[in-house]
């Protein structure tokens, strides 16, 4: 993802801009999938079955994903002021790893003692990717642009964390 985003940010070809939109769409769907998986793990625990906080986490995950998809759609269609739209996209990109880390923390906190050692590699792997994404997108929000060097190693960081996710 990082190399494709770097190539699309350095070139101004319109069909590559469409690839950039597809990459951002894939990133949104990846986060939505991890949200669904982590919420499924949380729902399996007794402490979250009849809890209003769990419903709040679901609403937050759905709204963040929808916000990102709407902003992406507006960007692709060319609607809205670019400055406001790009800020919205960057804030959404920064908020998504934050929510993912909150969900991951809740999964780890509510794990039983028997399953704690089984869930630690998952938590380390996902936390590594989310911390790097938070670094990348918080810097982008501060400076209103993505750092090309950090973006180019994003794929390497995500690939380095994958062995922790595999059984």
Label each residue range with its predicted role.
Residues 108-120:
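Hydrophobic, small-residue-rich membrane helices and short re-entrant helix-turn-helix hairpins
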Residues 10-14, 105-111, 141-142:
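Secondary-structure edge/capping motif, primarily at the C-terminal ends of alpha-helices
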Residues 1-101, 122-134, 149-166:
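Individual alpha-helical transmembrane segments in multi-pass integral membrane proteins
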């Amino acid at each position: 993802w990082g190399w494709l985003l770097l190539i699309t940010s350095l070139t101004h070809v319109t069909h590559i801009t469409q690839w950039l939109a597809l990459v951002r769409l894939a990133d949104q769907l990846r986060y939505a999938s991890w949200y669904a998986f982590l919420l499924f793990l949380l729902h399996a625990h007794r402490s979250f079955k009849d809890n209003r906080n769990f419903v709040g986490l679901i609403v937050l995950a759905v709204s963040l994903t929808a916000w990102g998809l709407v902003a992406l759609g507006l960007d692709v269609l060319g609607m809205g002021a670019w400055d406001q739209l790009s800020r919205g996209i960057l804030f959404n990109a920064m908020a998504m790893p934050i929510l993912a880390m909150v969900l991951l923390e809740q999964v780890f906190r509510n794990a039983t003692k028997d399953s704690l050692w089984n869930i630690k590699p998952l938590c380390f792997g996902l936390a590594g990717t989310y911390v790097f994404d938070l670094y990348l997108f918080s810097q982008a929000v501060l400076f209103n642009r993505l750092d090309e060097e950090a973006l180019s190693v994003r794929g390497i960081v995500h690939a380095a964390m994958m062995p922790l996710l595999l059984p």
